[in-house]
Amino acid sequence: MARARRVKRDSVTHIYQTCKQAGTCPPDVINKVEQTTVADNILKYGSAGVFFGGLGIGTGRGTGGVTGYTPLSEGPGIRVGNTPTVVRPSLVPEAVGPMDILPIDTIDPVEPSVSSVVPLTESSGADLLPGEVETIAEIHPVPEGPTIDSPVVTTSKGSSAILEVAPEPTPPTRVRVSRTQYHNPSFQIITDSTPTQGESSLADHILVTSGSGGQTIGSDITDVIELQEFPSRYSFEIDEPTPPRQSSTPIERPQVVGRRRGISLTNRRLIQQVAVEDPLFLSKPSKLVRFSFDNPVFEEEVTNIFEQDVDMVEEPPDRDFLDVRQLGRPQYSTTPAGYVRVSRLGTRGTIRTRSGAQIGSQVHFYRDLSSINTEDPIELQLLGQHSGDSTIVQGPVESTFVNVDISENPLSESIQAFSDDLLLDETVEDFSGSQLVIGNRRSTTSYTVPRFETTRSGSYYVQDTKGYYVAYPESRNNEEIIYPTPDLPVVIIHTHDNSGDFFLHPSLRRRKRKRKYL
């Protein structure tokens, strides 16, 4: 019989990760991962009372830790528990006293006559201002270049000798110049001869100023450029009135002569033309097809599809949109009269087949927008206060006009006399501000009548101290409620009591028995 092969168990860490959540971990796996074995407990509780840090005992690899091992033959090591030795320097530092810096005289504090004022010694203070600027120029001598041996060419013939001499190479010269400058904020250097605005170019300087003139420095001017005067900021021109426009911002676009693809919306043979006057057609066209709620977030700029049940018949808000199942997006065009037209192409679902298909005609819904009317220009007045622009008009009530003829003599007998009827008062009497007195006795009481300001006819309020009654004719039908009573009569029974506080009804008294035979 073959012996079963032993399968190696998985690592402890992987077993702990898979079985910890299920709670099926072996005890040895839990103790090893969580460090709760017997050896771990000995080290854990034993290290609390004993310290083996300086002996090099640990669970490392035997390398001596971070600092390594100390050989026995080399100097003494540091013992655990003892105070470390303080390393002192070989030279003792000397203390610097005040005598080395400034001479100080001692004062006897016992003698009261000694002054406590310390005399000041005159010494030259430090110069804080910069002195002379020292300029140092370091010039390095030219080093000697390498020597080049030139070959000498000789010939044995009688011709002249030709010597080829190579030029000596010249090394670059290195010069370093140092410069020191101090900034003085109270001194300003003017680099230009004329403190005006201008532009400089090489040797010929041309200064261009506005209103203050200028100077020309350099060569003579050869070319004269004719300058044009710019108008001042207060001058303006009044333009001619523009012709009437069809839009607020007209754009000149070239007219493209071509044929539009598809069916034209104005084709009356194939598409029904319906003019819409309701302004909801521009913003919310779906409200003309069916009753719905208003959603301010949704903008109807796309095609609207309306689904309607076959058995359900709804009346639209507008009869022109009856049986409309699809309404296209808005299209903008221009009419021959110059108006802007907003169009929407709709499809009706008038007929429905058994298969579910809807058949209907196409409808062109459009609305022409109003044109921009051209108004006459209005002369505007300047803002502000100006003399002679105000007009004061006084009515005839506030002024008196007297017709006086200076040419006539007042004492002349030919003066025309006026009639006395002109002196009569033609004023209509108005009792709107009068008071009404109630009572026939002499000692009457005055009552204040309030006046109500109204645009209607005058109304007055009169106070009556005797009171008044207001009768409102009305009739009420109060139904009488009949409560049901039992058929048996109500019998009140009083018990016989000799106390004498009540009387028993005679019918309730006990009758005496009559005996027929004694």
Swiss-Prot record:
Cell compartment(s), UniProt: Virion; Host nucleus; Host early endosome; Host Golgi apparatus
Sorted UniProt keywords: Capsid protein, Cytoplasmic inwards viral transport, Disulfide bond, DNA-binding, Host endosome, Host Golgi apparatus, Host nucleus, Host-virus interaction, Late protein, Microtubular inwards viral transport, Phosphoprotein, Viral penetration into host nucleus, Virion, Virus entry into host cell
Disulfide bonds: C19-C25
Residues spanned by motif Nuclear localization signal: 1-10, 510-517
Gene Ontology CC entries for this record: host cell; host cell endosome; host cell Golgi apparatus; host cell nucleus; viral capsid
GO biological processes: microtubule-dependent intracellular transport of viral material towards nucleus; symbiont entry into host cell; viral penetration into host nucleus
Sample GO molecular function, one term: DNA binding
Chief site of localization: virion
Entry PTM: Highly phosphorylated.
Function: Minor protein of the capsid that localizes along the inner surface of the virion, within the central cavities beneath the L1 pentamers. Plays a role in capsid stabilization through interaction with the major capsid protein L1. Once the virion enters the host cell, L2 escorts the genomic DNA into the nucleus by promoting escape from the endosomal compartments and traffic through the host Golgi network.
Subunit structure: Interacts with major capsid protein L1. Interacts with E2; this interaction inhibits E2 transcriptional activity but not the DNA replication function E2. Interacts with host GADD45GIP1. Interacts with host HSPA8; this interaction is required for L2 nuclear translocation. Interacts with host importins KPNB2 and KPNB3. Forms a complex with importin alpha2-beta1 heterodimers via interaction with the importin alpha2 adapter. Interacts with host DYNLT1; this interaction is essential for virus intracellular transport during entry.
Family: Belongs to the papillomaviridae L2 protein family.
Full protein name: Minor capsid protein L2
Organism listed in the record: Human papillomavirus type 8
UniProt gene name: L2
